[in-house]
């Protein structure tokens, strides 16, 4: 059963400007593993914007926004084919587990100007 959906869109230029002003903000939003993915990417601003948007979309699918947990409690990894995989930790995981067995489906896309993410929280 679908418990929640979330969508978020962001201008890539906003992310690029944030990176140019203070790259350290990445350490506040992303786990070490996510930062390793970022460092391997050629189009860093697009990649970061997509992942930022994904975390926002997942928080909306949980039905809470970022209440009771931080950005780092939602990690976006990828499988061998590059499909985004959501890993919930801390408060985000507690919220999802409160619904029972769960799975988060996620899609991320971008063009040169915007990144968008769509998340679906399924409970069983």
Curated annotation (Swiss-Prot):
<feature type="binding site">
    <location>
        <position position="8"/>
    </location>
    <ligand>
        <name>Mg(2+)</name>
    </ligand>
</feature>
<keyword id="KW-0963">Cytoplasm</keyword>
<dbReference type="GO" id="GO:0000287">
    <property type="term" value="F:magnesium ion binding"/>
</dbReference>
<keyword id="KW-0808">Transferase</keyword>
<keyword id="KW-0443">Lipid metabolism</keyword>
<keyword id="KW-0276">Fatty acid metabolism</keyword>
<protein>
    <recommendedName>
        <fullName>Holo-[acyl-carrier-protein] synthase</fullName>
        <ecNumber>2.7.8.7</ecNumber>
    </recommendedName>
</protein>
<dbReference type="InterPro" id="IPR037143">
    <property type="entry name" value="4-PPantetheinyl_Trfase_dom_sf"/>
</dbReference>
<keyword id="KW-0479">Metal-binding</keyword>
<keyword id="KW-0444">Lipid biosynthesis</keyword>
<keyword id="KW-0275">Fatty acid biosynthesis</keyword>
<dbReference type="Pfam" id="PF01648">
    <property type="entry name" value="ACPS"/>
</dbReference>
<keyword id="KW-0460">Magnesium</keyword>
<dbReference type="GO" id="GO:0005737">
    <property type="term" value="C:cytoplasm"/>
</dbReference>
<feature type="binding site">
    <location>
        <position position="56"/>
    </location>
    <ligand>
        <name>Mg(2+)</name>
    </ligand>
</feature>
<comment type="similarity">
    <text>Belongs to the P-Pant transferase superfamily. AcpS family.</text>
</comment>
<dbReference type="InterPro" id="IPR002582">
    <property type="entry name" value="ACPS"/>
</dbReference>
<dbReference type="InterPro" id="IPR004568">
    <property type="entry name" value="Ppantetheine-prot_Trfase_dom"/>
</dbReference>
<dbReference type="GO" id="GO:0008897">
    <property type="term" value="F:holo-[acyl-carrier-protein] synthase activity"/>
</dbReference>
<dbReference type="GO" id="GO:0006633">
    <property type="term" value="P:fatty acid biosynthetic process"/>
</dbReference>
<comment type="function">
    <text>Transfers the 4'-phosphopantetheine moiety from coenzyme A to a Ser of acyl-carrier-protein.</text>
</comment>
<dbReference type="InterPro" id="IPR008278">
    <property type="entry name" value="4-PPantetheinyl_Trfase_dom"/>
</dbReference>
